[in-house]
Amino acid sequence: MKVRAAALGLAAIFSGLQTAAHAADDPLKVCLDEDRPPFSAHHRGKPGTGFDLTLAQAIADRMGRPLKIQWFESKLDEDSSPQLEANALLSDGRCSLVGGYALTRDSLVVPGVKTARLPDFEGATRDDRRRRIDIGVLTPSQPYVYSPLTVVLGPKARGRTINNIGDLSGLRLAIESGTLGDAILMSFEKGRLIDNITHLVPGRDDLLGALERGDHDATLLDLARFDAYRAAHHDTGLSASGYYYPIGANRGYVALAGESALLVAVNTALADLQAEGKIAGFARQAGLTYLQPREPTIIGDVWEKIIQR
């Protein structure tokens, strides 16, 4: 009896070792947006690039696992939801982590629906585009970068000192309709700037191009977007004001709620990479202005905060 028990014990240990070894061989599957430079970018026939890709590789290396990227295309229409897109990708097993995810309370709430459609992704079939996926609940990692909005100045306003939104008074402002920047500028001091604001349509009008031509003097947009523009236009006449709007979002990974062990490993790797200064280095390499995560880790109702200000 003792011999049989010992044999069973050894079998269990051996089985556990096999499972652990198999897990180490399994690729770490991470979903990244194919069109969000300098965070992540991938075009057919070319290797992927970006801060999030380099960071994901470093985390996989720390975990002793190969990395597999599932590229996806986030929709720009009004009905799209980054939360549901990420949830569908995770729930369908396309990846275990979604990178570059904005950590807001609204983006992490329990979904109000039970199913969601997948975004378009590399390798998707016609059936994939039709399917609805039973979705779960998202859980975040610790953040690894802070993403603020910044004021970008056109050639005619170059050198203007901007310390707050009020300093935009008198400038010809351009903003994309329906964005956070739109809400901030339109609601500032009960509409003080409204008469100087021109609204452009996201995805149709070229906001930064119009600013470059001198059609407008300034705009308010995501800092990373301006980083990407500068990388693609080395001779740009646009300039960074150095002013960051005080409400921004940390970015991190999200996984499904049942992936606690994975998130512990990811958080350990992130903490080590942060302490070694590697994350800031990855950002410099990608041309991303790096700002360390800030408290609160998960921001509350962004719209409410803007209105209150």
Predicted regions and their residues:
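Bacterial N-terminal signal peptides
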Residues: A7-G16
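Extracytoplasmic small-molecule ligand-binding "clamshell" domains
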Residues: A24-V109, L200
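Short loop->beta-strand "edge-of-pocket" segments that line small-molecule binding or catalytic clefts
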Residues: L28-E34, T49, N164-D182
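Periplasmic-binding protein-like
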Residues: D33-D35, D127-L138, Q142-T150, L223-G287, ...
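Ligand-binding cleft/hinge of the Venus flytrap
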Residues: S40-H43, A56-F72, T115-A116, N164-D167, ...
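A ligand-binding cleft/hinge motif common to bilobed small-molecule-binding domains
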Residues: S91, G99-R130, I184-F188, E212-I247
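Flexible hinge/capping segments at coil-to-helix
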Residues: Q142-Y144, G154-L173
